[in-house]
Amino acid sequence: DRMAPIRAMQVFGDAGGKLEFTAFDTGVSELGWILESSLMACEFWESAKRQGNLTLFCPARPSRLEFRHDAAILELADGTTLSARLLVGADGRDSWVRQAAGLAAVNSPYGEKGLVANFATAKPHRNIAYQWFRDDGVLAYLPLPGNRISIVWSTPDVAADELCALPPEQLCERVAEAGGHVLGRLELLTPAVAF
């Protein structure tokens, strides 16, 4: 009950534009899947543990990085030393690897945030993902199991903060109205967060 297929999409643009497509039309059983990020992270972890050609060092913290002409040498806090011809820094926005390698980064504010929340819907979504390109941003309704959806509303920073501050009933009405009440009345299931 933590993942659901997308069997169709309806995309709405400005000036009344609309695009619809289905998994059936494209010859596949589903266009994609919506699942909780924690479920995907857990599956990635379990898959990594099953790989015969992968050694996991967990938990571990890096303490020192050195580059030689033929290798990158990474020392862990417990004293373990690792050597490789290629070092990939996939450790997030505030990357320790990037900083230790002396690589500069420029952070540019987007000027908008993604508001995320889950709702119960009065009408069934029938595994349809909806997306609206609006003057105030892009809103997506993503199907979850049962009569539930997850929404992502990419909107300017100030608008996202205002939406997060609304009482649940008002947020439900704003999100339902922005989506043309396509799924009827909404009930907030999780707190709205913006990032």
Identify the residue ranges that each predicted region occupies.
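FAD/FMN-dependent oxidoreductases across multiple families
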Residues: 161-195
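Conserved N-terminal helical subregion
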Residues: 3-100, 108-113, 168
